[in-house]
């Protein structure tokens, strides 16, 4: 099985919260697609609660679009990581990490403005696969964590696992 890019970085050295360019690629028409690792929690030490991350998934994508789309950037998708330590964001364009971090903080401030669970988009049996698994309180706790922290930048060259380590891990 081919080694995915996300598994070539050392998760024991990742900062959180932090932005990382996980991957860039060109479309056949020459557009750049950038995938960002938005790391909310320190891997293997912290995790977002399932109801909170699910509610954040419903809120985060819209709020990030409000703050990041434009000036050559259009978000394609924002999805939670299975490990519950962050989100992946795929977009058209190449915004600087600082611009992404600023939009992330602004989106978290928007999460705190949501007053009631009934204001969570697509929170119904028709548009959500587990519509009963939500917590606005947990999502807002996550938002407070980000707003109370400096959002750092994780660089791939600083986190790259050396070839000998990958060989040792039999990857």
Swiss-Prot record:
One of its GO terms (biological process) is quorum sensing. Its cofactor is Fe cation. Binds 1 Fe cation per subunit. The keyword Metal-binding applies. Keywords: Autoinducer synthesis, Iron, Lyase, Metal-binding, Quorum sensing. It catalyses: S-(5-deoxy-D-ribos-5-yl)-L-homocysteine = (S)-4,5-dihydroxypentane-2,3-dione + L-homocysteine. It comes from the Bacteria. One of its GO terms (molecular function) is S-ribosylhomocysteine lyase activity. Signal peptide: none annotated. Fe cation binds at residues 54, 58, 128. Its EC number is 4.4.1.21. Homodimer. Belongs to the LuxS family. Involved in the synthesis of autoinducer 2 (AI-2) which is secreted by bacteria and is used to communicate both the cell density and the metabolic potential of the environment. The regulation of gene expression in response to changes in cell density is called quorum sensing. Catalyzes the transformation of S-ribosylhomocysteine (RHC) to homocysteine (HC) and 4,5-dihydroxy-2,3-pentadione (DPD). This is S-ribosylhomocysteine lyase. It comes from Photorhabdus laumondii subsp. laumondii (strain DSM 15139 / CIP 105565 / TT01).
């Amino acid at each position: 099985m081919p080694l995915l890019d996300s598994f070539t970085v050392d998760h024991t050295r990742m900062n959180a919260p932090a932005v990382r360019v996980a991957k860039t690629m060109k479309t056949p028409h020459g557009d750049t697609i950038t995938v960002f690792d938005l790391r909310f929690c320190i891997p293997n030490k912290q995790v977002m609660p399932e109801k909170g991350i699910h509610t954040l998934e419903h809120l985060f994508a819209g709020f990030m679009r409000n703050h990041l789309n434009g000036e050559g950037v259009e978000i394609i998708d924002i999805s939670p990581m299975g490990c519950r330590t962050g989100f992946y964001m795929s977009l058209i364009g190449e915004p600087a990490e600082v611009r992404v971090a600023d939009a992330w903080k602004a989106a978290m401030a928007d999460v705190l403005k949501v007053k009631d669970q009934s204001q969570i988009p697509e929170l119904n049996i028709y548009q959500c696969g587990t519509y009963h698994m939500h917590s606005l309180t947990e999502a807002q706790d996550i938002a407070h964590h980000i707003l109370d922290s400096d959002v750092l930048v994780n660089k791939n060259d600083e986190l790259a696992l050396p070839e000998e380590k990958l060989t040792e891990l039999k990857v």
